[in-house]
Amino acid sequence: MEMEEAQEMSQMPGRDSPPPNDVSEENDEAMPIPEDLSASSNLQHNNRGDKEGLACNIKVEARCDEENGLAIDMMMNGEEEEECAEDLRVLDASGAKVNGSHAGGPDSKGPYSSAGGIRLPNGKLKCDICGIVCIGPNVLMVHKRSHTGERPFQCTQCGASFTQKGNLLRHIKLHSGEKPFKCHLCNYACRRRDALSGHLRTHSVGKPHKCAYCGRSYKQRSSLEEHKERCHNYLQCMGLQNSIYTVVKEESNQNEQREDLSQMGSKRALVLDRLANNVAKRKSTMPQKFVGEKRFSNISFEGGPGELMQPHVIDQAINSAINYLGAESLRPLIQTSPTSSDMGVMGSMYPLHKPPAEGHGLSAKDSAAENLLLLAKSKSASSEKDGSPSHSGQDSTDTESNNEEKAGVGASGLIYLTNHITSGVRNGVLPLVKEEQQRQYEAMRASIEIASEGFKVLSGEGEQVRAYRCEHCRILFLDHVMYTIHMGCHGFRDPFECNLCGHRSQDRYEFSSHMTRGEHRY
């Protein structure tokens, strides 16, 4: 068999082939067969042996050229795969070549490949450490870096290291300030594609995610989940969730029908939603919320840490109170008896208002409940003025929902509850009948009577002074603004949890000490 191949190789064009009579003349001579094809060129034989050795050398050189060409192709493919390491989809998905060897071929050594994984029957690779299945050796190589801790791509400006080149390129945009993703409807720009897709939803008309208890709508499911965690956990603690569920459900159904009528024939929302889905390269399960850059480089650290942190805490609490209540509603509430000409207007706008004869007999608990309802109405008036979405440069995915959820930072849970109960007033429509409103008012009064005790504050002249009491800390405030700032420091899940840094105290003494010292860690 080797002789026939040698003869065929010797008859290639450009080579001298022996004449046919030479074969018949030298049949009687012994024909040596070389044991090592690579060393056959060094053997000195007769004319026939030299030509056969030359043919064998040609065959060996052809095989070496094929192997060298295959190795060069694999090296070039390896360099290209290294450059495309950030895009895991550009790979050799067939699994035909793994470092120059074929799966199941004579050069492969069992089920293991040189990439450090286990070759599966379908051509994929399985990690030998955690068992994850990868579609190719490049994916497995990037995955192995999570086990070894290798981060070959390093930023030259700050020294941050990454496992993939795409993450490094995204990080470099932080230094350059480049924001390639821009909104075509406003001046908003961001660095991430998923942030742009979330911003495009702020331009859409509808809010598909609606709360089944209070009727509030959100554009993102994550905002709805946060709302349920804040609002309805508090309702369950107060025992009011079942009592107001039926009332608010009817109101939410009416609002739903009204929104459906307003959105019929509107194609803009559908186009924006499709555009947001097409722009998003990957799904954002939990949208990022940009809190803001904290720059401490210009601060002189001559004072103690408590002195440096305290102004920041006060500013944050004041901003939270202003964002929730608005500048108009932060003024102290002074009850004045309405004139006879205003009684008709007051009766139509505020059915819960009591006549002057009954107003003198109201206790402090009744007036506190009325103040809560008035605060909710003042909040609804201020929220209608700020209806347009914010198009700032922050990477926020749901600006309107974030502004609505800031309500939980600036005031107590009871005010937050009242704002949800009177959602019809906030929308400018009062669909509830008088009996349902009376039921809400009685529920509010009952909750206040259970949670609070009667008190009376007198001035130096003996006149009664309006006071606001924190039920958690048992502190009286003569100023409504200071009371609102203080209530903004309490958490919703736990009243003794700091709403600024999340520190949980055992009792009111530890909570007051924590707020006084200003030891907030972010």
UniProtKB/Swiss-Prot annotation:
The keyword Zinc-finger applies. GO terms for biological process: negative regulation of DNA-templated transcription; regulation of transcription by RNA polymerase II. The lineage of its organism: Eukaryota, Metazoa, Chordata, Craniata, Vertebrata. PROSITE patterns: ZINC_FINGER_C2H2_1, ZINC_FINGER_C2H2_2. It comes from the Eukaryota. This is DNA-binding protein Ikaros. Its main location: nucleus. It comes from Oncorhynchus mykiss (Rainbow trout). GO terms for molecular function: DNA binding; DNA-binding transcription factor activity; RNA polymerase II cis-regulatory region sequence-specific DNA binding; zinc ion binding. GO terms for cellular component: nucleus. Expression mainly limited to thymus, spleen and pronephros. Very low expression in liver. No expression in testis, brain, eye and muscle. A zinc finger (C2H2-type) spans 125-147, 153-175, 181-203, 209-232, 468-490, 496-520. It is found in: Nucleus. Residues 1-48, 96-115, 379-406 are annotated as: Disordered. Disulfide bonds: none annotated. Keywords: Activator, Developmental protein, DNA-binding, Metal-binding, Nucleus, Repeat, Transcription, Transcription regulation, Zinc, Zinc-finger. Belongs to the Ikaros C2H2-type zinc-finger protein family. Binds and activates the enhancer (delta-A element) of the CD3-delta gene. Functions in the specification and the maturation of the T-lymphocyte. Also interacts with a critical control element in the TDT (terminal deoxynucleotidyltransferase) promoter as well as with the promoters for other genes expressed during early stages of B- and T-cell development. Function is isoform-specific and is modulated by dominant-negative inactive isoforms. The gene is ikzf1.
